[in-house]
Structure formats: C-alpha cells, structure tokens
C-alpha cells in the first residue's frame, strides 16, 4: 500500500470519527452525515485508484445497479420503516463478510495470503472469525427485519433448553474454528457458516418486536466487527478502523438503551432479551416497561413537534 493511499485512508478514518461525533446530537447531525459521505467518497476513490483493480467495467455495473436500488429505496422508504431498513442493510454486510472469506479461502493468492492448503494460521483465524460473525449478523438481521416488517410474529419465541442449545452451538463453532485453522478443510468452513446461520436465528427469535430497536443496534455492532474481519482478510486498514468504530459504537448504544429500559445487556448477547416478557405474559396485563428520559430528550421532542398540548 502506497504512502498516498495510506494517507487517504487515514483522512477517511478521521472523517468517519468526526461523522460519529456529529451524529451524536440533533443540531450537528446534518454536518455529521456530510462528513460521513465525504469520508466514504474519499475511501471509494482511493480504492478504485489502486493499480490492482482488474475490471472497472464490472465495478461500474455493480455501482450502477446498487445505486439505482439504493436510491429507489431511499426515495420510497417512510421514516417509520427505517429500523427494518437498517436491519436489512446489516444483513448484507454480514453476507458480504461470508463471501469475502469464502473468496479468500478458495483463492488465497488473490489476497496475498498464500496458496490453497497452505494459508497462514493468522489469516485462517481472521477468516473464520469474520465468517462466523458475518453469518450470525446475516440471519439475525433477516429475522429482525421480518419481525419489524410484520413478516414474522413479533412475539418472543421461547422454548425449553434454548440457552443450552445456544451454548452448545457456540462451543461447537469455536471447536470448528480451531479444527478448521489446523486442517484447512472446506467442509469445516461451511459447517462454521451453517452453524453460525443457525445460532443467528436462535439469538433473535426469543426477542419481542417491541424490543427490536435494541437488537438492531446490537446487529449494527455485529456488522461492524464483520467489516473489521473483512479488513483483516483484505489487509485494509480503513475497513479495520471503520469496522471497529461501528462495532464499538453499536455496542455502546445498545448498552445505553438497555440501561434506559432496565434490561440486561448480557441477555441481548445471549438471546434471552424477550424471555422475561414471555414468562410473565400470564401475569398482570396492564404492566408496562418503564422508559426513562431526560431534559435533552424532552427538549428534542418539543423542538421537533408541530403541535404541543399542555394539560
């Protein structure tokens, strides 16, 4: 990677950080969004200027198709439907991580990580972990999208031994990753993908539709770590930095939301977020989850309200 490319990626990373800073407050959100767009533009132009790019025609076609689809969705989407749109986009990031890892496994020479059957241990670890996170993100986001859109029931789906099955699957994925890094067997690679797909579903189905915003934020974190995994596979510092930013900010936001709703952050990670609601469904029906707010929340709602009624 040339010095100029490294410098451009560094500038993009700084712009992404400033973008997150701007998006943290309504008054600076527009500026933060602009800085994010600018950073992404610099990153794309820098990547396309790489001499290693083989076909601008194929990239141009992909840009055109993706741009048309994205523009069409952005024009038609309602503000109330943004959470499920974000969940759908997260699923694509996870699937991309799986595809990149598969490409690196079957054609490692294209990624400068050795040859088939003799990939370095470090690259195998990065590849397999990125694959697992990406696969979990993909299926988890699909279920979240379905719940928010109404394609899947928003009621928590809880069954006996659920956490035990999740634990077994988690340990099984770890064992498969270790075995894959030793044997470099393609069957093990796809077993990792399949097991991660399954646990991604099992982690989200016990969560109620009303609590989906927290899960979307958590899946945002997962997609960030998946992107960071892609960055390690591609030896791309910008992807690593950006993925880490998205991953950490998504996790922090999820923690803040859980704290504000008196929920356990650990339950989000373990897929037991909706369990308490499901277990207490037969109790007093008038119980509601208390939602905390502060002066900043009240000021924001009043500032953006068209009509205010004071009783």
Give residue ranges: language-model regions.
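Mobile "lid/hinge" segments at catalytic clefts and subdomain interfaces of large enzymes
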Residues: 208, 222-266
């Amino acid at each position: 990677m040339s010095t100029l490319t490294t410098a451009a990626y560094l500038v993009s990373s700084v712009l992404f950080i400033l973008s997150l800073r701007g998006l943290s407050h309504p008054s600076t959100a527009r500026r933060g969004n602009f800085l994010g767009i600018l950073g992404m533009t610099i990153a794309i132009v820098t990547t396309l200027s790489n001499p290693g790019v083989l076909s601008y025609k194929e990239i141009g076609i992909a840009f055109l198709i993706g741009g048309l689809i994205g523009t069409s969705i952005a024009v038609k989407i309602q503000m109330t439907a943004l959470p499920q749109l974000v969940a759908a986009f997260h699923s694509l990031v996870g699937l991309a991580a799986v595809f990149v890892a598969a490409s690196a496994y079957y054609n490692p020479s294209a990624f400068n990580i050795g040859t088939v059957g003799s990939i370095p241990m470090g690259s195998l670890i990065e590849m397999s972990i990125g694959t697992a996170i990406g696969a979990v993100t993909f299926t988890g986001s699909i279920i979240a999208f379905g719940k928010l859109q109404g394609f899947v029931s928003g009621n928590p789906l809880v069954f006996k031994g659920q956490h035990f099955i999740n634990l077994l699957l988690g340990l099984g994925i770890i064992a498969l990753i270790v075995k894959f890094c030793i044997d470099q067997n393609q069957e093990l690679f796809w077993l990792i993908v399949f097991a991660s797909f399954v646990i991604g579903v099992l982690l989200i189905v016990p969560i109620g539709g009303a609590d989906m915003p927290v899960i979307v934020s958590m899946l945002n974190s997962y997609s960030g770590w998946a992107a960071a995994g892609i960055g390690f596979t591609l030896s791309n510092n910008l992807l690593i930095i950006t993925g880490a930013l998205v991953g950490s900010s998504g996790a922090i936001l999820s923690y803040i939301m859980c704290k504000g709703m008196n929920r356990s952050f650990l339950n989000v990670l373990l897929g037991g977020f909706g369990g308490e609601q499901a277990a207490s469904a037969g109790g007093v029906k008038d119980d509601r989850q208390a939602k905390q707010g502060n002066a900043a929340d009240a000021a924001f709602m009043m500032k953006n309200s068209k009509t205010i009624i004071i009783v």
